[in-house]
Amino acid sequence: MPQKRLQMLRGLIELVRPHNLVVAALTTLIGYGTVASIYGGDIVSSGYAYAALIVVLVAAGGYVINDYYDIETDMVAKPWRPIVSGRVSPGAARFYAYMLFTIGLIIALVTCPNFIVFGFAVLNALLVHEYSRWIKRTGLPGNIVIAFNSASTIVFGALYASCMIKGKVVLPSVALIPVLYAFLLVLGREFVKGIEDVKGDAIAGIGTLAVRFGVRTAYMASVAVLGLVVVLSPFPYISGVYNMAYLILALVVDVLIAYSLAILGRGVARGLEDAIRASRRARSALKLAFMVGALAFLAGLM
């Protein structure tokens, strides 16, 4: 294979962020597995494979289109990214993104011809596209969209499972527990990221909580949201759907959240520069907390 084509192929793979797609597939399994355990279906099945494939394709399209709309920013901040480095042309990237969106939505329509399931897939494709195009620059609404999209993989897995197992869309209320958990955890992480990026966001005119109201307010918002995650963490076990393995790992998540808030609180108390440095460590801890949380729900279903 000629060197140029090999570089383009590597660029196309890099654009879809494979490690993030693995996480998306796992969170889809949380929703699918929760509904399957309630209705007596197989957790790991061809139905789940289709659901994960749809989510992965739509998410991959979202990551590609994000790089497409971030060309100007990446020229300065990330010149090694596939498009700005010249490995993938902007036109090829845009075609690639729309192809991924289209294939994912076609699979959703063909494998589960249900208006709610297909409509939810379309909604998510539109949101990830519009987030990249303009919503990300709105600040708080952008934070909410990111949190929604992260949690929506669980919702889609649950909707798709009910379609495959029951033949109709039924969303048990207990399936919404991991959805709320993921939404709040990611939203809190977005508030922390807003502290980390406060200087650049202020220059770009992005109205995050940290920019509009200060890093202390953004910190207090993250405390409120992430504190709610800790408060809610026992309820999945209490519901009877998730076993003791969930509870043990959920406690690890709680510790990671407490750690991130503690180091961020100390940083905020010392001033802006310390807050920014502390937010990097806090965000890394929260990213780990999200992964452990996903594993908690998966282990809790076994």
From Swiss-Prot:
The chain crosses the membrane at residues 21-41, 43-63, 103-123, 144-164, 167-187, 218-238, 244-264, 282-302. GO terms for cellular component: plasma membrane. One of its GO terms (molecular function) is magnesium ion binding. Pathway: Membrane lipid metabolism; glycerophospholipid metabolism. It comes from the Archaea. GO terms for biological process: glycerophospholipid biosynthetic process. InterPro entries: DGGGP_synth (IPR023547), Prenyltransferase_related (IPR050475), UbiA_prenyltransferase (IPR000537), UbiA_sf (IPR044878). It is a multi-pass membrane protein. It catalyses: sn-3-O-(geranylgeranyl)glycerol 1-phosphate + (2E,6E,10E)-geranylgeranyl diphosphate = 2,3-bis-O-(geranylgeranyl)-sn-glycerol 1-phosphate + diphosphate. Its EC number is 2.5.1.42. Belongs to the UbiA prenyltransferase family. DGGGP synthase subfamily. This is Digeranylgeranylglyceryl phosphate synthase. It comes from Hyperthermus butylicus (strain DSM 5456 / JCM 9403 / PLM1-5).
